[in-house]
Amino acid sequence: IIIDGGSSDQTLQLIKKYSTRVKCLISEKDNGIYDALNKGVKLATGDIVGFIHSDDILASPQVISNIVNKFKGNTADIVYGDLLFVDREKPDIIHRFWHSGEFKKSKLRYGWAPPHPAFYIRRALYKKYGCFDLNFKIAADYDQMLRLLLVPYLQIIYVPEVFVKMRLGGESTKLNNALLSTKEIIAIMRKHNINWQVAILTRKLSKLWQIFSKFKRSNIS
């Protein structure tokens, strides 16, 4: 399923080259990225839902099959992995390594969350807990993940594998959106009864660790 925001470049022509592999294409103006994601969720018919944004790259051809096998083998509700922030022009150059780590509910109090592009869930959870809140323009994915991760009985599986390479320069990584992103994250933390003063600080520190982990990962490689 491809949701396009009414592109005026060569996007649609490129998609047509792969028309036999595209189940559904919508190209129309929307109310932002989360409106587009909500459209995709409503059109989905499979058991598992995940998202790949236009600048994202699956880390390997085996990523999707590995995710599906985890759902099958563990009757999981949520499966998530790791993510690499890479150079926009040269995606082999790593800028940050987002190592998610094993899930512990206590980590949510410190601003922890897995990377949304590496977060796959059963479609039934959208029906039960809702889609993305369009009141948030940049951080609705964080709100949606918290909504699910705080549910006590869901089976959540971490896969220590890079699922996605994200090119730097997305909406939430642009400088002019940094203040709005922080404002929304604080509002979301308050909504979910998380001490935002502590969580925002530890969240910022975790980004420094991601940069350090990049060098550590490079040395291992």
Model region roles, listed by residue range:
Residues V162, K174-A199:
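Catalytic core of nucleotide-sugar-dependent glycosyltransferases
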Residues A140, E171, I185-A187, I211:
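A generic membrane alpha-helix/interface feature
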Residues R190-S221:
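Membrane-proximal basic amphipathic "stem/tether" segments
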Residues Q13, K17, N69, A187, ...:
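Charged/polar, solvent-exposed surface patches and flexible loops
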